[in-house]
């Protein structure tokens, strides 16, 4: 049986809520954020809101770090919560023009602009001469840069969230 530890942080207060059975954790490799669904029991102490950090460990291993995006309270004392990792912010649309950047540098640029945390971002090496991305999701901007890298180097890279840090690996 797995030992699951889930906590929610609201400011400086950390809660270890009573979680009902049925936590679901979804990971997809391309173009989608990690998603955590769970139901907590509302008591007189638990106080959290959208945007608060959520962390989950399984058997002592860090597996999910994200943020509450929605919560729905039923007629009783149960609150259904959906949290996403920071790749959720890659669904934002924006316009970018860049010159002579690697896919790694594009990811670091987007992370800096959106205040996202990065971990290991491997150097993809291939410099993209010039690109204009008009009203594209950040996922599409990154995927285009990675596709151009694969076409020119035959090396494939994967972007994922490693417990709260954007990570790019070959």
PLM feature spans:
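Short beta-strand-centered interaction patches in the first periplasmic/extracellular domains
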Residues: 78-79, 85-86, 120-170
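Short intrinsically disordered coil segments
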Residues: 52-56, 96-101
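Second-shell loop/turn segments in exported
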Residues: 92-100, 129-132
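Assembly/oligomerization scaffold segments
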Residues: 1-89
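Alpha-helix C-terminal capping segments
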Residues: 57-58, 111, 118, 159
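Solvent-exposed, acidic/flexible segments
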Residues: 47, 99-104, 134-142
């Amino acid at each position: 049986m797995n030992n699951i530890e889930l906590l929610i942080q609201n400011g400086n207060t950390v809660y270890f809520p009573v979680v009902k059975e049925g936590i679901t954790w979804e990971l997809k490799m391309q173009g989608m954020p990690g998603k955590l669904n769970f139901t907590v029991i509302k008591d007189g102490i638990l106080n959290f809101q959208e945007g608060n950090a959520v962390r989950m460990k399984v058997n002592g291993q860090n597996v999910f770090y994200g943020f509450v995006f929605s919560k729905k309270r039923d007629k009783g004392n149960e609150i259904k919560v959906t949290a996403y990792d920071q790749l959720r912010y890659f669904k934002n649309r924006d316009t970018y023009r860049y010159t002579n950047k690697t896919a790694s540098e594009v990811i670091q640029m987007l992370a800096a602009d959106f205040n996202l945390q990065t971990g290991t971002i491997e150097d993809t090496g291939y410099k993209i001469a010039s690109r204009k991305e008009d009203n594209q999701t950040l996922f599409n901007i990154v995927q285009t840069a990675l596709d151009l890298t694969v076409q020119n180097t035959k090396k494939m890279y994967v972007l994922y969230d490693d417990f709260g840090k954007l990570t790019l690996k070959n």
